[in-house]
């Protein structure tokens, strides 16, 4: 009887060990399955992390490029601002220079016109400003005790011989040639300046303040 009980106890122990082994194997299989699933998930996570890292790298590259482009644009805008400010300053300086030049030009013209008026009275010569610079047209008045002598002239401004003849003729009549020539020169300068923006007449293309006069025509007396 005792032997039978011993065998039954042994069988139970063996059976228990067997069942325990089965449970351990089941747990081991379950654990292996979980480990495999974990490894699989971990691999997926690593791949996702790599993909994310690549995307982040591309995004960082784009951000860097955009930042460099933005820096260039900012630098360009700053350069434009500096250039604009410099242009404004140059424009203001130019306006001041132009204003000063105009003022000096008006002053010079007034001085020249005053000189022309004085020389005209001194020499008795009156110039037709409308005929200049193509022609020198006017009259020189020689005042006498009883009557005045008029010497009219309608002169082309490119005749050297005419200028020489006129100068000799007026000089023979005791006209101050230095003042007379200065009067003609100043009147010519004023005419040239006033007509500078427009197309000059063909006859004035080579104008050098040279005068002609026909001395064969008789002089007039009053």
UniProtKB/Swiss-Prot annotation:
Coiled-coil stretches: 51-100
UniProt GO BP: cell division; meiotic metaphase chromosome alignment; meiotic spindle organization; mitotic metaphase chromosome alignment
Phosphoprotein recorded as keyword: no
Keyword entries, A-Z: Cell cycle, Cell division, Centromere, Chromosome, Coiled coil, Kinetochore, Meiosis, Mitosis, Nucleus
Subcellular location: Nucleus; Chromosome, Centromere, Kinetochore
GO cellular component, one term: Ndc80 complex
Biological role: Acts as a component of the essential kinetochore-associated Ndc80 complex, which is required for chromosome segregation and spindle checkpoint activity during meiosis and mitosis. Required for kinetochore integrity and the organization of stable microtubule binding sites in the outer plate of the kinetochore. Participates in SAC signaling that responds specifically to disruptions in spindle microtubule dynamics. The NDC80 complex synergistically enhances the affinity of the SKA1 complex for microtubules and may allow the NDC80 complex to track depolymerizing microtubules.
Subunit and interaction comment: Component of the Ndc80 complex, which is composed of Ndc80, Nuf2 and Spc25.
Similarity comment: Belongs to the SPC25 family.
The protein's name in its UniProt record: Kinetochore protein Spc25
Lineage, opening ranks: Eukaryota, Metazoa, Ecdysozoa, Arthropoda, Hexapoda
Originating gene: Spc25
């Amino acid at each position: 009887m005792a032997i039978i009980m011993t065998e039954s106890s042994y069988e139970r122990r063996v059976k228990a060990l067997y069942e325990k082994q089965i449970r351990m194997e089941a747990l081991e299989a379950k654990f292996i399955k979980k480990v495999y699933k974990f490894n699989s998930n971990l691999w997926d996570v690593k791949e996702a992390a790599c993909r994310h890292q690549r995307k982040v790298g591309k995004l960082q590259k784009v951000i860097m490029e955009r930042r460099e482009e933005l820096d260039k644009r900012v630098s360009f805008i700053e350069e434009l601002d500096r250039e604009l400010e410099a242009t404004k300053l140059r424009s203001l300086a130019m306006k001041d220079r132009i204003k000063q030049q105009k003022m000096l030009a008006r002053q010079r013209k007034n001085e020249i016109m005053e000189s022309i008026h004085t020389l005209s009275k001194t020499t008795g010569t009156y110039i037709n400003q409308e005929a200049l610079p193509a022609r020198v047209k006017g009259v020189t008045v020689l005042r006498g005790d009883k009557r005045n002598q008029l010497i009219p002239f309608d002169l082309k401004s490119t005749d050297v011989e005419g200028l020489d003849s006129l100068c000799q003729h007026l000089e023979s009549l005791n006209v101050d040639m230095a003042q007379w020539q200065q009067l003609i020169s100043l009147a010519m300068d004023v005419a040239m300046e006033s007509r500078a923006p427009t197309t000059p007449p063909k006859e004035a293309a080579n104008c050098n303040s040279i005068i002609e006069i026909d001395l064969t025509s008789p002089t007039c007396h009053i």
